[in-house]
Amino acid sequence: MKTIEVKILDPRMQEQLPAYATAGSAGLDLRACLDAPITIKPGETHLVPTGLAIHLADPGYAAMILPRSGMGHKHGIVLGNLVGLIDSDYQGQLMVSTWNRGQTEFTLNPMERLAQLVIVPVLQVGFNVVEEFDTSERGIGGFGSTGKH
């Protein structure tokens, strides 16, 4: 298992480090490091601190902050930026852009699991400018071009 550096910015996080819920989990749960509950009205967004900073250091990796499926499905709580991309050289606090796309108010409590952190490999590329591409089976077919079923 690869390890990454983590800085605890809020002492409450000492006992609440992100962890995999099961042996097969891809994401580490992130918690809302709040001093008091916040109520998020329909259509509102809040930037919620996690109390943690990470430093991946290796440009071959990035982190993604993703929604927890139950939060979106049951409560309409998703990420305001849809996916949070954390570059390998970022060292600031992890923040979760939280958007209530539902129809009712949602109360987020201190230390509630809010999102998940997934570490992914990254390949940095250069560009080879061409006039034309070699022909492929798909060509320029875009949205819906491979059929409905």
Curated annotation (Swiss-Prot):
Pathway: Pyrimidine metabolism; dUMP biosynthesis; dUMP from dCTP (dUTP route): step 2/2. CDD domains: trimeric_dUTPase (cd07557). Substrate binds at residues 68-70, 81, 85-87, 95. Its cofactor is Mg(2+). InterPro entries: dUTPase, dUTPase-like, dUTPase-like_sf, dUTPase_trimeric. Its EC number is 3.6.1.23. It catalyses: dUTP + H2O = dUMP + diphosphate + H(+). GO terms for molecular function: dUTP diphosphatase activity; magnesium ion binding. The keyword Lyase does not apply. The keyword Disulfide bond does not apply. Pfam families: dUTPase (PF00692). Gene3D superfamilies: 2.70.40.10. Keywords: Hydrolase, Magnesium, Metal-binding, Nucleotide metabolism. GO terms for biological process: dUMP biosynthetic process; dUTP catabolic process. PANTHER family: DEOXYURIDINE 5'-TRIPHOSPHATE NUCLEOTIDOHYDROLASE. This enzyme is involved in nucleotide metabolism: it produces dUMP, the immediate precursor of thymidine nucleotides and it decreases the intracellular concentration of dUTP so that uracil cannot be incorporated into DNA. Belongs to the dUTPase family. This is Deoxyuridine 5'-triphosphate nucleotidohydrolase.
